[in-house]
Regions:
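Specific register positions within alpha-helical solenoid repeats of the TPR/Sel1-like families, i.e.
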Residues: 1-4, 35-36, 66-75, 113, ...
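Short pre-active-site segment immediately N-terminal to redox-active cysteine/selenocysteine motifs
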Residues: 145-147, 152-156, 187, 220
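Thiol-based oxidoreductase modules, predominantly thioredoxin-like and allied folds used
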Residues: 176-190, 200-210
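Short solvent-exposed coil/turn linkers within tandem alpha-helical repeat scaffolds
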Residues: 2-9, 16-29, 33-40, 49-60, ...
């Protein structure tokens, strides 16, 4: 009953926004809060706010909200172009509006960076750092090889399962020209301990300062990037069967 009541309250809020409050100067943050919803009807309401609210700042917040909701519709070029258009509008109209400890402008610029640098078909950044042995290492040293770049941490959600999936991937493809490279912000002592007991037999970046995580805009763990021989991104997502299918398809070429 509580869940049904929550849904009913949310529906009433959206309906009130659609019919009464869409021109209010105070609904910008509400539009951003609605980005967690995947209902197309909600996007239409936010689009109404963007088009008809008299405040440029509210229009900009609505533009950012629309761009974030479009993110869930895939990486089709037309969708990407629409997202960039809304993000640019957000930067122009609401660049100084604060959202938590950041601003609309920073959020929008970050999303544009991801679209232009961290989507399928783009060349991945050349992560540079040191591995668990303290040796200098960078992705470009592996040019010509398929790379599975896996961001993980011992305290991530379902860590045991995630590391098990990565271990299986390493076992299946490690001898077939595929390099599994981990990136973790765990302490160097923890990383070396896991290497010593063979829990993580693959090579890992030690990223205690989070620089590589920031470079790849990592927000949730685990996350895997599959890169081809030219370091172009072919898959982004969690470890599991889709990683295997992507790797198999690339090895078959």
């Amino acid at each position: 009953r509580e869940e049904g009541s929550a849904v009913s309250r949310a529906a009433r809020i959206v309906e009130a926004l659609r019919t009464v409050h869409y021109q209010s100067a105070r609904v910008g943050m509400l539009c951003l809060a609605l980005t967690s919803q995947s209902d197309p009807a909600i996007m239409k309401v936010v689009e109404k706010v963007e088009a008809q609210n008299p405040s440029g700042e509210v229009q900009g917040q609505a533009s950012l909200a629309i761009a974030m909701m479009l993110k869930g519709l895939g990486d089709d070029p037309e969708i990407m172009e629409k997202r960039i258009g809304h993000l640019r509008s957000a930067i122009i109209k609401a660049h100084e509006v604060e959202v938590g400890d950041t601003t609309v402008s920073k959020l929008a610029m970050d999303e544009i960076f991801i679209i232009q640098n961290l989507t399928k078909g783009r060349t991945a950044p050349d992560a540079i750092g040191r591995d668990s042995s303290g040796e200098p290492f960078k992705l470009s040293m592996l040019k010509g090889k398929v790379i599975v770049l896996a961001f993980w941490h011992t305290r991530m959600r379902e860590a045991e399962r995630g590391l098990s999936l990565l271990s299986k991937l390493h076992e299946q493809h490690g001898q077939r020209g595929v390099d599994l490279i981990g990136v973790t912000s765990d302490s160097l002592a923890v990383l070396r301990g896991l290497r010593a007991n063979n829990t993580i037999p693959w090579r890992n970046f030690s990223d205690e300062d989070g620089r590589i995580h920031s470079q790849f805009r990592v927000r949730d763990l685990p996350i895997v990037y599959v890169l081809d021989a030219e370091r172009k991104i072919r898959y982004i997502g969690g470890p599991g069967s889709f990683v295997d299918l992507t790797v198999e398809g690339m090895l078959a070429k």
